[in-house]
UniProtKB/Swiss-Prot annotation:
InterPro entries per the UniProt record, alphabetical: FCP1_dom (IPR004274), HAD-like_sf (IPR036412), HAD_sf (IPR023214), TIM50 (IPR050365)
Native species: Yarrowia lipolytica (strain CLIB 122 / E 150)
Any Gene Ontology CC annotation: TIM23 mitochondrial import inner membrane translocase complex
Protein name in the entry: Mitochondrial import inner membrane translocase subunit TIM50
Subunit structure: Component of the TIM23 complex, at least composed of TIM23, TIM17, TIM50 and TIM21. Interacts with preproteins in transit.
Targeting signal (transit peptide) range: 1-29
TM ranges: 113-133
Gene this protein is translated from: TIM50
Keyword Protein transport listed: yes
Family matches, as SUPFAM superfamilies: HAD-like
Intracellular or extracellular location(s): Mitochondrion inner membrane
Keywords, alphabetical: Membrane, Mitochondrion, Mitochondrion inner membrane, Protein transport, Transit peptide, Translocation, Transmembrane, Transmembrane helix, Transport
Function: Essential component of the TIM23 complex, a complex that mediates the translocation of transit peptide-containing proteins across the mitochondrial inner membrane. Required to direct preproteins in transit and direct them to the channel protein TIM23, and possibly facilitates transfer of the translocating proteins from the TOM complex to the TIM23 complex.
CDD domains in the record: HAD_FCP1-like
GO biological process terms held by the UniProt record: protein import into mitochondrial matrix
Amino acid sequence: MHSLLRAAQIARVARPGVKRAMTPAVRFYSDKKTEKSDQPFQSSLLNDDLLAQAGMDVDESKGKSKPAAEGKSEGAAEGATEDDVTDEQRARWAGTAKKSTDQTSKQESRERIAGYGYYAFFAGSAAFAAYLARDWDNEEDKKKHDTIGQGYTPMLMWARLKARIGDTFSFYRDPVAPVLLPDPPAPPYQRPLTLVIALDDLLVHQEWSREHGWRVAKRPGVDYFLGYLGQYYEIVLFSSQYMANCEKLIMKLDPYHAWFSHVLTREHTTYEDGKLVKDLSLMNRDMGKIIIIDPDTGCTMKQPENSIPIEPWKGTPGDKELVKLIPFLEWLVSQNVNDVRPILKAFDGTYLPDEFTRREAIAREKFEKDWYAKHGKDGQWASKFLGVSEPKQQKPLMPHDVMRREGQKQYQKFLEYLAVEGPKLKAEEERMIAEQKAMGPKNLSEAVSSIGSLPPVPQQPTEPKA
């Protein structure tokens, strides 16, 4: 090895300098290329003389063949060039030459295993799809998908496949229960109409900023809207948020559970076409006696005829749009209607508060004119006979005017009741919650051990001895 290094140093020193010709740097394609030199190409500086001086056997080094990595056979390495190889030799060597690759055997094995995995995945998917496309095998599926029959035609198989896949994701698409509200109370305690209202951008507005984080604004007139109409309507709060996110906010709006008869959240919505839908047909109420107020039109897409349109509130102070709906809603409940949908359709395409005010003014003018025509001169003869002045007549009241006067009195009385009894009711509720927590498991191990066990039998009171 030392001799080889010494010979390389001698060759580097003894090599004469090569003068470069002053040729132009730019060559045109029209110029003729120089012919190849007939002299053999010297692949190494270690020629025979230098190897001999270093003590190497020149004949032995010539007899060794080149490595197989250079892609040439032994015969070609002895002096045969690429032009000397015949087509017959190329054809014979084609099957024996190893494909050049940078991958190791482990990488090739991994790719082969991955290919088998792909085949197994696609085969398993096809088998699972065929299993899902089978005929209905129970009466529940037949009843649920009564429009899809039995058989193994491509259309029926595809329909059953989609139906079963849809049933798999129904947990995220359908509400938590097929019926959202319990049965209504008995007639003496049942409200004549049900009012479904949204939470976001109707009663409150939530916004987030880097400076303050989340902030919630309550719409002006919300307390009066809920407290006053709660006397006549079964108010159902239907929020698009999850219960875990809006529970504290609802408790702030109704701390004594006085306004909302029921509370529904996002878990009770239906997911259709990328939108959250509040399906009123699942509320266990007469569809002719349900009204929904929601600024999101996508939530009311299934029953738009039961909806009162309203613009979303963005936190503007001094807003009165919600309070403007009270006269129409109190008039509607005073009419004892069997179906509110034709009445709401009559206001379609108009701004309901202003349109109702205009129509009410016309009806009031006619009502007062008829009343004065009937009662205007009653009692005038007695006043003239006795020589006293005529009493000043008050304007006649329409039926919903009388209801409004009595309703406001009852609303004030109820506020006074809550001011006195509300804290007591809140304290009683907190006490009951604390008792329930005390009766429950105190840690996870107790909760796991209590699964499947029967509740403790209450002790019977002993009779006192005589």
